[in-house]
Design a protein with these regions (language model features):
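Amphipathic alpha-helical
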Residues: 10, 15, 246-280, 313-356, ...
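Basic, alpha-helical terminal appendages of large translation-related enzymes
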Residues: 1-34, 313, 325-328, 388, ...
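Long, charged, mostly alpha-helical binding arms that flank functional sites
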Residues: 2-5, 96, 279-284, 414-417, ...
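Helix-rich, typically C-terminal accessory recognition domains appended to large enzymatic cores
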Residues: 152, 199, 204-211, 467-496, ...
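N-terminal catalytic cores of NTP/NDP-binding nucleotidyl/phosphoryl-transfer enzymes
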Residues: 26-102, 126-137, 298-299, 364-401, ...
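Residue patterns forming the tRNA-binding/recognition surfaces of aminoacyl-tRNA synthetases
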Residues: 4, 13, 17-21, 94-294, ...
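Catalytic alpha/beta core of large soluble enzyme barrels
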Residues: 60, 73, 316-416, 424-431, ...
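Conserved oxyanion/phosphate-binding beta-strand-loop segments in alpha/beta enzyme cores
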Residues: 1-38, 68-77, 100-107, 265, ...
């Protein structure tokens, strides 16, 4: 058999063999330690995989192979996030059904995954558009529909418990709810009760101003609007009022924030979630108007005495109620124009302020003065109450607005006790810092941190307001006016909404040839009579909800289904999820930080509260891959720019193992980097050298003293490499995994004629086993040619000897008073006393002591000595 390095001779052979033998099939829950390694649920596009996608999948495959060799029970599955706009739009363009496209596209993805040696367990393959899957998405919807969040116990409870409590006690013991007696509840008609319970359900329907994508002709969730544009179409989003279904994610805001401390995620992802949830503490203050009390939220109640006007969001219901006849025309025109702009545009820093007076006034009760009410688009309905008290002296946006429209500025905070108060007429910008209250009645002289608490308490005592917490987070809107999605399991009758019985799931998506989006805002399903019209068990004729769920509903629980994908009796087996979850390593793009990652955490917590899951967080460890850029390093790879490189063309020229190792070697995993063919050639050369060392016999020297020393050196290198590669795989440092293996290969090459057969065999055996996760095809072929028992991927990972892997020398940083003054290399086994003594005698330290006696010598073992004088 030729020993020439030619990947085409064996890569396809082993891919077929592994698949035939189901080598990577995952066993059930058992006594072994587990490792659940998961990639983000991909949508299988018609373009197939690019080398950029491989940057995600190769490292998780290496990790999976490594843990299998470590004796772990590894779950490394794959499936398809098949519902949604991309598949539907592509199918409309090609005049076919989306299901056919998904089958075609996913088959190509599977071919490419096999081509590059990804060890998925295909027995667990999922497709979110299959009824066997979305039946359970609908079941979870019903779990949320039949639940409410009880703040007294800080968890979700069955809605039936709330109904029982209302029948006994009304709302008397439920905090923050309008008074309702048991008698009033018991006298309500069924429809009235349903409407009342909608205020509590975790899945509910409500009229809402929504984000409308005019290109996709559907509603978008807040998280799907990026800088005012649809996240897929790029179209400027419009505002519409529609009846929509929502999940009450806001009930979990505090827990979503607090539990970030439980998980090992990149700090920037945690920060994005914190900012998106946007928790802020302050006060809710009431201002009296002719249409009733107008509530505002402020984080600075200490500036209440400086409020000189009020501003309403164009969407605020009080705009229509309060606008006087003399001003109504200009108000209506302004509101219409404002709704054409996205929230991002409206709140952009530096944008010129616009607004109109609505002809009405509110009373600032702290000084019993009427102040004018304006409508302006810089106030957003999605934050706070959609109304603000404008304090131009201490808020920059309010200051700019006041200066433009000639509104009064009243200074109520000065910089400090001895500071001179600002002159409102001379101010060029608002004073937004902390300070001391002035012209604020009984609170004059109170400093800001204390004042905020004192004023809030005073508002509560006097009935003017109360302490409040506000969130930027809004409930998750799931309704989509498109065909290709999970049907919402609700039927409408003359008496109101009726949830579909779990026994009648799934509500199947009809197989139709025409499903183009409508211009009316209705879902295409509304035009399919056989889907819409349904007879209920009691003989009532109803009509189905025709909106479908947004695709993020499907991806909010797929990690649970992978543990038990063929279960026809339940969404998942409780024993299996208890064993496998949470996911140990989750890998995908940072762009999903405030969509999929937030939604999945919410669903997990809700299902935990309802007794279905024994854990609170779905993904224990998260990593985001860096982007592969075009070779020029400036552009993303994209089909439109014609710069996409596919794994197919790379494997054809260089082989799958060269592609895999280059994907890892190219840079740190989380760093964006350009594609470089020269680097690919380098990994190819390295693999060829490793191949030759592993398969070509070399002459060994006659053992002598020189050989013994060479053996000791090689053994140390071998065990150090095993330790380093093991630690770096687990630490997701794949570039240093490859560089360590390259260095070890070169060391083997240089030492092969100077070491004994025993030492060389130990080293090459270790190299081959360490190559198995990163270059699985070559490793399997070499293993086979050595006539070893199939398969190398079922062998044990090499162990290292701690003594041999230990460093013989260390480099200590030498500091004097915390400043680095030098470095010193010394034996690793030096004691602390010896290290201190050597450091004090070194020229670098003595020079900076300048004759002074050290006060203290701080020793950090193996790292530094700091001399304090």
């Amino acid at each position: 058999m030729s020993i020439r390095w030619d990947p085409k001779q064996f890569e396809a052979k082993w891919a077929a063999k592994w698949e035939e033998d189901q080598l990577y099939k995952t066993g059930p829950a058992d006594h072994r330690p587990k490792s659940y390694i998961l990639d983000f649920f991909p949508y299988p596009s018609g373009d197939g995989l690019s080398v950029g996608h491989c940057r995600n999948y190769v490292p998780t495959d290496v990790l999976s192979r490594y843990y299998r060799m470590r004796g772990y029970n590894v779950l490394h599955p794959m499936g398809w996030d098949a519902f949604g706009l991309p598949a539907e739009n592509a199918a409309i363009k090609l005049k076919t059904n989306p299901a056919k496209l998904i089958a075609q596209f996913s088959a190509n993805y599977k071919r490419q995954f096999r081509l590059i040696g990804i060890s998925f367990d295909w027995n667990r393959e999922l497709n979110s558009s299959h009824p066997e899957y979305y039946r359970w998405t609908q079941w979870i919807f019903l779990q949320l529909y039949h639940s409410w969040y009880d703040t007294r116990v800080n968890r979700a409870q069955p809605i039936s418990l709330l109904e029982s409590e209302l029948a006994r006690n009304g709302t008397s013991e439920i905090p923050g709810v309008a008074a309702l007696s048991a008698k009033e509840w018991n006298s309500m008609r069924p429809g009235q009760r349903r409407d009342f319970l909608s205020r509590f359900r975790l899945a509910y329907r409500a009229v809402s101003t929504v984000n409308w994508d005019p290109v996709e002709k559907t509603v978008l969730a807040n998280e799907e609007v990026i800088e005012g544009r649809g996240w897929r179409s790029g179209a400027l989003v419009e505002k519409k009022k529609l009846n929509q279904w929502f999940f009450r994610i806001t009930a979990y805001a505090d827990r979503l924030l607090a539990d970030l401390a439980m998980i090992d995620w990149p700090e920037h992802i945690k920060l994005m979630q914190r900012n998106w949830i946007g928790r802020s503490e302050g006060a809710e203050v009431r201002f009296h108007t002719d249409a009733g009390d107008l509530c505002i939220f402020t984080t600075r109640p200490d500036t209440l005495w400086g409020a000189t006007f009020m501003v309403l969001s164009p969407e605020h219901p009080f705009v229509e109620r309060l606008a006087t006849p003399a001003y109504k025309a200009q108000v209506d025109a302004y509101v219409t124009e404002a709704k054409r702009h996205s929230d991002k545009e409206r709140s952009a820093e530096g944008r010129e302020k616009t607004g109109v007076f609505i002809g009405a006034y509110a009373t600032n009760s702290v000084y019993c003065e009427r102040i004018p009410i304006w409508v302006a688009d810089y106030v957003l309905m999605g934050y706070g109450t959609g109304a603000i008290m404008a304090v131009p002296a201490h808020d920059q946006r309010d200051f700019e607005f006041a200066r433009k429209f000639g509104l009064p500025v009243r200074v109520v905070i000065k910089a400090g006790q001895g500071a001179k108060p600002l002159d409102a007429a001379e101010m060029e910008a608002a004073w937004t810092g902390e300070g001391v209250m002035i012209d604020s009645g009984p609170f004059d002289g109170t400093s800001t941190p204390v004042a905020v608490k004192k004023v809030t308490a005073w508002l509560e005592e006097t009935g003017r307001g109360k302490q409040a917490v506000n969130y930027k987070l809004r409930d998750w809107g799931i309704s989509r006016q498109r065909y290709w999605g999970t049907p919402i399991p609700i039927v409408y009758t003359p008496d109101g909404e009726v949830p579909v019985s779990p026994d009648d799931l799934p509500v199947r998506l009809p197989d139709v040839s025409h499903y183009e989006p409508t211009n009316s805002g209705e879902s295409p399903l509304a035009t399919i009579a056989e889907f819409v019209n349904v007879a209920l068990p009691d003989g009532t004729v109803g009509h189905r909800e025709t909106d479908t769920m947004g695709t993020f509903a499907c991806s909010s629980w797929y990690f649970l289904r992978f543990t038990d994908p063929r279960n026809s009796l339940a969404a998942f087996d409780t024993k299996e999820v208890a064993y496998w979850l949470p996911v140990d390593m989750y890998v995908g793009g940072a762009e999903h930080a405030v969509m999929h990652l937030l939604y999945a955490r919410f669903w997990t917590k809700a299902l935990h509260d309802l007794g279905h899951l024994p854990f609170l967080e779905p993904f224990q460890r998260l990593r985001n891959q860096g982007m592969i850029l075009a070779p020029d390093g400036k552009e993303k790879m994209s089909k439109s720019k014609g710069n996409v490189i596919t794994p197919d063309e790379v494997v054809e020229e260089w082989g799958a193992d060269a592609l895999r190792t280059y994907e890892m070697f190219i840079s740190d995993f989380e760093q964006a980097t350009p594609w470089n063919t020269n680097g690919l050639a380098g990994t190819h050369r390295w693999l060829r050298r490793a191949w030759e060392i592993l398969l070509e016999p070399a002459c060994r020297p006659t053992p002598d003293a020189t050989t013994d020393q060479a053996d000791r050196n090689l053994r140390r290198w071998t065990h150090k490499t095993i330790r380093k590669v093991s630690q770096d795989i687990e630490g997701f440092r794949f570039n240093t995994v490859i560089s360590s293996l390259m260095e070890f290969t070169n060391a083997l090459y240089d030492s092969q004629k100077h070491v004994s057969e025993e030492a060389f065999t130990e080293a090459t055996e270790a190299l081959l086993l360490m190559l198995a996760p990163v270059a699985p095809f070559m490793a399997e072929e070499v293993w086979d040619r050595k006539h070893r028992t199939y398969s190398i991927h079922q062998q044990a990972w090499p162990a290292y000897d701690e003594a041999l892997a230990a460093d013989e020398e260390i480099t200590l940083v030498l500091q004097v008073n915390g400043k680095v003054r030098g470095r010193l290399t010394m034996p690793a086994n030096l004691s602390e006393q010896e290290a201190r003594s050597v450091a004090l005698q070194s020229e670098a330290v003595r020079r900076h002591l300048d004759g002074h006696t050290p006060k203290k010598v701080i020793y950090v073992p193996g790292k530094l000595v700091n001399v304090v004088v």
